[in-house]
UniProtKB/Swiss-Prot annotation:
This is Voltage-gated potassium channel subunit beta-2. The modification Omega-N-methylarginine is found at residue 28. It comes from Bos taurus (Bovine). Gene3D superfamilies: NADP-dependent oxidoreductase domain. NADP(+) binds at residues 56-57, 63, 85, 158, 188-189, 214, 243-248, 254, 262, 264, 323, 325, 329, 332-333. The gene is KCNAB2. One of its GO terms (biological process) is regulation of potassium ion transmembrane transport. It comes from the Eukaryota.
Length: 367
């Protein structure tokens, strides 16, 4: 795992105490007298991000109204969350429009925000997707127009592109950073080998390497974030920004009796999620969640709070991206920070015993 207190570690944490009007927990979850919020370094970069970020996939420009999106962003910002993530492909660009409109309307200082977007699928034309120099530059320009921003803090390559030479992609990312369109760049859903290749190309040609990988991470998907990325962090300083802590809602427990109406699995285009939930493996996962629910009750928290705190307990995770469709849901998820100190080694061991899927690095062969 990652070091606990080295200077370059994403485990470096600080607490912010503010007098902002939005309390970090609603009365339902027990509001503390003072607002506390963790910040971590994004990989070995100097960029400080809140350990919880707000994502816009499915929700912004789609599942929720623009008014609800504004309410969620305001709640997040008032509670110390500074990281907001989107992508050119989310709701065919509308998610970026909604996000940009809210930032403009609220008048928040741009320097207080960390805005990230992802480039790969921009349009239907052959030249409007992928990681060519052309699409990275044109795609990011279009994203910035929709966001009404001069720059994003991190631009992510939303998939690896086997049709584009790695050197071309790394040169294009370096170019948009040098042009002031982005501060940093990262990867999403890339393999360790691909990230390492990008780093090697950057070092060979004196270009800018990626600082972060966006990866799926939850109780049922652990290998990449717990085994592969720690090695990359130690070798080249790439951090982890994780998404789907509730496995698209599976870990929330709402699918234990089937597919509720208006849930994500009931939406058009999410048949894959419905199939996953109703599969034999899905039923096994629901049985494990019932056991985890007992641990959550013992700790005085909800199952989603336990699941998010479990992701945060990994010191290699710089930030966990949350998805929310209601204010109550977001406040409940933010409440996971209160659960984090309760996750003792014995509790973690108990959770691992229930899950039965703890991955081991090749370096652990003696243990």
């Amino acid at each position: 795992m990652y070091p606990e207190s080295t200077t370059g570690s994403p485990a470096r944490l600080s607490l912010r105490q503010t007098g902002s009007p939005g309390m970090i927990y609603s009365t339902r979850y027990g509001s503390p007298k003072r607002q506390l919020q963790f910040y971590r370094n994004l990989g070995k970069s100097g960029l400080r991000v809140s350990c919880l970020g707000l994502g816009t996939w499915v929700t912004f420009g789609g599942q929720i109204t623009d008014e609800m999106a504004e309410q969620l962003m305001t709640l997040a910002y008032d509670n110390g969350i500074n990281l907001f993530d989107t992508a050119e492909v989310y709701a065919a660009g509308k998610a970026e429009v909604v996000l940009g409109n809210i930032i403009k309307k609220k008048g928040w200082r741009r320097s207080s925000l960390v805005i990230t977007t992802k480039i790969f699928w921009g349009g239907k034309a052959e030249t409007e997707r992928g990681l060519s120099r052309k699409h990275i530059i044109e795609g990011l320009k279009a994203s910035l127009e929709r966001l009404q921003l001069e720059y994003v803090d991190v631009v992510f390559a939303n998939r690896p592109d086997p049709n584009t030479p790695m050197e071309e992609t790394v040169r294009a990312m370096t170019h948009v950073i040098n042009q002031g369109m982005a501060m940093y760049w990262g990867t999403s859903r890339w393999s360790s080998m691909e990230i390492m290749e990008a780093y090697s190309v950057a070092r060979q040609f004196n270009l800018i390497p990626p600082i972060c990988e966006q990866a799926e991470y939850h109780m049922f998907q652990r290998e990449k974030v717990e085994v592969q990325l720690p090695e990359l962090f130690h070798k080249i300083g790439v951090g982890a920004m994780t998404w789907s802590p509730l496995a698209c809602g599976i870990v929330s427990g709402k699918y234990d009796s089937g597919i509720p109406p208006y849930s994500r699995a009931s939406l058009k285009g999410y048949q894959w999620l419905k199939d996953k939930i109703l599969s034999e493996e899905g039923r096994r996962q629901q049985a494990k969640l019932k056991e985890l629910q007992a641990i959550a009750e013992r700790l005085g928290c909800t199952l989603p709070q336990l699941a998010i705190a479990w992701c945060l307990r990994n010191e290699g995770v710089s930030s966990v991206l949350l998805g929310a469709s209601s204010a109550d849901q977001l406040m409940e998820n933010i409440g996971a920070i209160q659960v984090l100190p309760k996750l003792s080694s014995s509790i973690i061991h108990e959770i691992d015993s229930i899950l039965g899927n703890k991955p081991y690095s090749k370096k652990d062969y003696r243990s």
